[in-house]
Amino acid sequence: MHDCETNVTVFHEIVATLSSLVRLRRDLVVTTLPHLSNIICRLLFALRSPRPLLGAKQYTIVADSLPVWIEPSHPLGVEESKDLSRLLTLLSTKTLVRIHGTSAELSKPESLARPLSKHVGCILQAYFEVLNDPLCVLPADIRRELQPGLFVLCDMLNEHTRDALMVSALDASGKAAMKGLWREYEKQRYTGMG
């Protein structure tokens, strides 16, 4: 049974907790990267909204696939996609892990980009599944807000993983979505800025 209205606070708190862990305790997150990527996939699936004019059975299928704190008729919005995009961007940010003891004992700044690169494919695959869900939509404004975070994931994706994703993990519509995202990524990547 779903709540009467969507509780966006739950989404924001999940993202805030993950952001804090990524920013402050990278040493703990590195050992649980499959779990982190799975949670990010679940957050992407939570951004979906049912297509208009679905039948009762189809609507129930969509409602059952969403968390109980999301009312399908009042889906998550642009602010939540911005929040998730910030989390995705944070994954490539270099952070320090403070070792308890003297203040001189600091590790060098590192990001999760390298260890997470093995798991980026499944996050992008989840995004393409959300895009191509026949019973749901991902509105254009939400897709637009997710782009900076998705571009960070594309930056982490090595060529071998990208090719493997294209060949074996995606269907025809997923491949088209991947090509579209990659085209946009390439366009913004080589603008000469930064």
Predicted regions and their residues:
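C-terminal/domain-terminus segments
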Residues: 147, 166-169
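Amphipathic alpha-helical elements of HEAT/ARM-like alpha-solenoid repeat scaffolds that form extended
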Residues: 10-22, 55-56, 80-105, 142-154
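Long, acidic/serine-threonine-rich intrinsically disordered regions with weak helical/coil propensity
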Residues: 12, 69-73
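Amphipathic alpha-helical segments within extended alpha-helical solenoids and repeat-rich scaffolds
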Residues: 1-7, 18-21, 32-70, 108-135, ...
